[in-house]
């Protein structure tokens, strides 16, 4: 039986609140919107949080995933990846409009990384 431990960080949660637990989790989920409903705009400060978490993980030699959820779209995906997130949740950006075309756009951007 395999289980993964995840820590979710909502927008107002400072990185300092989760830092002591980074070596105890398999993944950190950074919420880039306030949780509750889809279609919200991406909170740009989330990129700084991802960068800070990635820097701490690298400094500790940890191979921990960083997932980002909320407002991710083709326009900000490259910045999200550059910041250090490696697991992406994109609901509205995929399912609004032509799903196949949206998936193709995401794969093209992710392929560059």
Identify the role of each PLM range.
Residues 18, 47-54, 77, 103-107:
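Generic structural signal for well-ordered alpha-helices
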Residues 8-46:
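Histidine/lysine/aspartate-rich catalytic loop segments that bind and position anionic ligands
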Residues 13-25, 70-88:
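Catalytic cores of alpha/beta
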Residues 8-12, 33, 69-75, 93:
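Active-site beta-loop-alpha junctions enriched in small/polar residues
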Residues 28, 53, 69, 80, ...:
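Conserved, mostly hydrophobic/aromatic
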Residues 57-63, 111-113:
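Short helix-capping segments at alpha-helix termini
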Residues 1-6:
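Short, small-residue-biased leader/transition segments that mark boundaries at the very start
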